[in-house]
Amino acid sequence: MRIIFMGTPDFSVPVLDALVAAEHEVVAVYSQPPRPAGRGKRDRPSPVQARAETLGLTVRNPVSLKSTEEQSALADLNADVAVVVAYGLILPQAVLDAPARGCLNIHASLLPRWRGAAPIHRAIMAGDTMTGVCIMQMEAGLDTGPVLLRRETSIGAEDTTGTLHDRLSAIGAKAIVDALSQLDELTPKPQPDDGVTYATKIDKSEAKVDWTAPAPHINRQILGLSPFPGAWTMAGGKRLKLLQSRVANGTGALGEVLHGLTVACGDGAVEISRVQPEGKGAMDAKDWLLGARIAPGTVLE
C-alpha cells in the first residue's frame, strides 16, 4: 500500500519500522518541526524524523495542515491510507479525506475509555488493570471514530507509564500491520456512548506528592508519572523524583521515612525503590540512601 505516515515521538518509531518491514510504500513521513533541545538549545528533529531520514524516507514538517497548499501537496501523494500515531497536529477534514482509504489512528487505550492526550498516564493513575491499543478510522471528533481492531494487555502492579508506553508501542506496530492486511475484511465498529472518559494532558502541578493521600493513590501517582514528568517530594531541601514504588505496610507521621525509603501516607505506606535526585540521573533508592543522610524519622515534604 502507498502510505503516508504521521507521527512525532518515540512511541511512533516502532510503528514506522513495522510498516517499512512489511514492505509498504511509505510515500512521505509527516512529523512536527525540529525543536530546540539539549543544553545548547539547538534545533533537534523529532524521533520519527530522525528515524525516517535514516530509512531514506521523504520527511515533511509543516507547522500546520490548514493551508490549501499543504492540503494539496498531501493529496498529490495519492496515498491509499494515512497512518497517524501521536502526530500532534489537528487534521482538517480535507486531510482526513485525501487518502483513498482515509486516515487510521493508533490510540493507546481501549476506546471510548481515555480519549485524548495522555491515555497511558491516566490509565495507571486511575488504577486500571487492563488497557490496550485501538486502530481507529479517524473523523473530525477527538478520538471518536469507529474502531477496526482492538488489542488488549494487562497493567501489572509494577508497570510505569514508561514500561507500558514501550509495550503498547510494540502492540500498536503489530496491530496496524495486521489491520492493513485485513482492511477489506474488517468492519469498523462505532464506539459506544457509555464509558467515555477523557485523558487530559498531564499538568506539572499533578506531580507534587501529597503525603496526606492514601498509599494506593500515591503509588498510582508515582507509577503513572514515571518517568515523565515524575512525581516528586522534597528531601533534605532538594527535589527528589520518585520513579518506582509499591504499597507497603506501616504507619507514622505523614511523609515520615519509616525504614529504608518506606514512607508513611494518609493511609498505609509506600516503599520507593527508584528515584532521581535533583540534577542527577535515575538510580536505585538504596544507592541514593547511601549518601543522602535520610534517617528513619525524617519527614519528606
Curated annotation (Swiss-Prot):
This is Methionyl-tRNA formyltransferase. (6S)-5,6,7,8-tetrahydrofolate binds at S109, L110, L111, P112. Attaches a formyl group to the free amino group of methionyl-tRNA(fMet). The formyl group appears to play a dual role in the initiator identity of N-formylmethionyl-tRNA by promoting its recognition by IF2 and preventing the misappropriation of this tRNA by the elongation apparatus. CDD domains: FMT_core_Met-tRNA-FMT_N, Met_tRNA_FMT_C. It comes from the Bacteria. GO terms for molecular function: methionyl-tRNA formyltransferase activity. Belongs to the Fmt family. The keyword tRNA-binding does not apply. Its EC number is 2.1.2.9. It catalyses: L-methionyl-tRNA(fMet) + (6R)-10-formyltetrahydrofolate = N-formyl-L-methionyl-tRNA(fMet) + (6S)-5,6,7,8-tetrahydrofolate + H(+). InterPro entries: Fmt, Formyl_trans_C, Formyl_transf_N, Formyl_transf_N_sf, Formyl_transferase-like_C_sf, GART_AS, Met-tRNA-FMT_C, Met-tRNA-FMT_N. One of its GO terms (cellular component) is cytosol. Keywords: Protein biosynthesis, Transferase. It comes from Jannaschia sp. (strain CCS1). It holds the Pfam family Formyl_trans_N. It is an enzyme of class 2 (transferase).
